[in-house]
């Protein structure tokens, strides 16, 4: 079904069954598969391929040669009808690739809202991306990676499969990330190592001084106290009673499976 207000270039191929929403613009030489839904106000600029069971929300901007919902690169994949779900107001730049999920990984690759995926970024099967993240040019996420909200991944960085990156993390360019990264941390290197709290980013997002102070103290407990993570958890729990932002650390540690960067 194609909404009457949608504008589709005659060179594009829209397979029967695709659902194209109000005021969608599809430029030249795009291909949209039969199980694709595209929400109101989204633009496919040109040469965009959207396949598989894929849902794209409203007001997204998708640039040339992006490939969304294509067959993933997991050798166990046998053509199951897994999904790709993309939220609203994302900017997906040239040559970005986003692969559909796998049955073993939950069946869905998911992108939230208001993200910027720069040129040549790759998001593999079953990744879960939050809101307002930035992946710089050539950043690559292996399968099952999770990014919290407001994560910045520097250009030419690679994140190992199953890694969890906490909210408000900033990863410097050219990093190789093979273990989980706690919230609010800045890290860089091969392999990535922590080098402080993302204070400037947190200030821009309205974190007040008491909250920043608490986050700094928790960072020092984790990385500078000489104690094990198990030993500092009770102290972090005490901070979380008065500073809700600190609870992100506790949620993160409960979910972490690969150990944290050191």
Curated annotation (Swiss-Prot):
Pathway: Glycolipid biosynthesis; lipid IV(A) biosynthesis; lipid IV(A) from (3R)-3-hydroxytetradecanoyl-[acyl-carrier-protein] and UDP-N-acetyl-alpha-D-glucosamine: step 1/6. It is found in: Cytoplasm. One of its GO terms (molecular function) is acyl-[acyl-carrier-protein]-UDP-N-acetylglucosamine O-acyltransferase activity. The keyword Transferase applies. Disulfide bonds: none annotated. Keywords: Acyltransferase, Cytoplasm, Lipid A biosynthesis, Lipid biosynthesis, Lipid metabolism, Repeat, Transferase. It catalyses: a (3R)-hydroxyacyl-[ACP] + UDP-N-acetyl-alpha-D-glucosamine = a UDP-3-O-[(3R)-3-hydroxyacyl]-N-acetyl-alpha-D-glucosamine + holo-[ACP]. Its main location: cytoplasm. One of its GO terms (biological process) is lipid A biosynthetic process. It is an enzyme of class 2 (transferase). InterPro entries: Acetyltransf_C, Acetyltransf_C_sf, Hexapep, Hexapep_transf_CS, Lipid_A_LpxA, Trimer_LpxA-like_sf. GO terms for cellular component: cytoplasm; membrane. Its EC number is 2.3.1.129. Signal peptide: none annotated. It holds the Pfam family Acetyltransf_11. It comes from the Bacteria. Belongs to the transferase hexapeptide repeat family. LpxA subfamily. Involved in the biosynthesis of lipid A, a phosphorylated glycolipid that anchors the lipopolysaccharide to the outer membrane of the cell. HAMAP family: LpxA. Homotrimer. This is Acyl-[acyl-carrier-protein]--UDP-N-acetylglucosamine O-acyltransferase. It comes from Histophilus somni (strain 129Pt) (Haemophilus somnus).
